Amino acid sequence: MRIRKNITKFIKRAYIDMGELKQVKGYTKTRLNIISNKVFLLKQELYPLKKQKKVGKLKKKRVTTYTRKKLKRILSLLFRIGGKIYRRKIKKKKINLKKKEEHFTNNLILYRLFRKFYINLKLKQFKRLYKKYKGNEKIIIQQLEKRIDMILLRSGFVRSIYEARQLINHKHILVNGNIARIPSYTLNVGDIISIKEGSHKQNLIHRLKKILLPKVVPEHKKNLIHRFVSKGMDKYKYNYKQKYQPNDKAKYQQNYKYQAKRRRESKKKRRIRATGPKYLEISHALLLISLIEEPKLTAIKYPFTLQPENNIKFISLLNKYKRIR
């Protein structure tokens, strides 16, 4: 009677545990540890119920009761769900949650910064690049900068990556004379990007005239597009005659002299490169882009401090977290 009561208690407890476990589909390490601990406790209570073998007598067939069969089924189900379950009870360890949270949050912030800078890039693409170029993390950024959508953005032909992807999807862009259909296609050194002839080419020329040409230009030269190499455009930025009325001559002269000195001092520092970075060669007249060299980290301007050997390694730590996308 005592044995039956104990077994009925085990069965009820096991069914409750199985009901809790079956609600969740994915099993994490913590949940598997809970299963293994429960199995350990069940076994610890079941083993003393088994009859010990007597030495010197013939073996007889064991009579299995219905309750023992139930217990075997429950234990088999637990082993199937758990997979590799530990035979021994797992000991609890003290963990500093503050350290783990700080490490995880810093990595998550870096991932979000990269994602804002390289829009439409998912964690899977970062993982593939990290597996390929593990140890040389600087090459990962070079590969990201060689993409067609990023080169169009760096050259100044496009305002955002979304616009670049739209042009590629609508088949307006050519690479070495062939239509480019994949925005994530990486270019090689010597490849040339051009724009397909059509209505969009004229719209792009009209938009580039407003951006590249200075405001103070004679009318007979407005139809031309200059081939800029590196030209300081600060002197075309200010138009003081529009700000001040003709009566305020003293204010105009004082401000003009002060700004003239300031421009001479900061002429070398403040320069707008119409051609974009050094690893690209651009002709705005023909609307062509060619990749001369592999991009360097010094040529790229990031909104945050870039240490690829430290900052890109967070991708390997985020592999476990499937919810992050």
Curated annotation (Swiss-Prot):
One of its GO terms (cellular component) is mitochondrion. Residues 146-209 form the S4 RNA-binding domain. SUPFAM superfamilies: Alpha-L RNA-binding motif (SSF55174). Its main location: mitochondrion. SMART domains: S4 (SM00363). It holds the Pfam family S4. The keyword Ribonucleoprotein applies. GO terms for molecular function: rRNA binding; structural constituent of ribosome. Keywords: Mitochondrion, Ribonucleoprotein, Ribosomal protein, RNA-binding, rRNA-binding. InterPro entries: Ribosomal_uS4, Ribosomal_uS4_CS, S4_RNA-bd, S4_RNA-bd_sf. PROSITE patterns: RIBOSOMAL_S4, S4. It comes from the Eukaryota. One of its GO terms (biological process) is ribosomal small subunit biogenesis. It is found in: Mitochondrion. Coiled coil: none annotated. Belongs to the universal ribosomal protein uS4 family. This is Small ribosomal subunit protein uS4m.
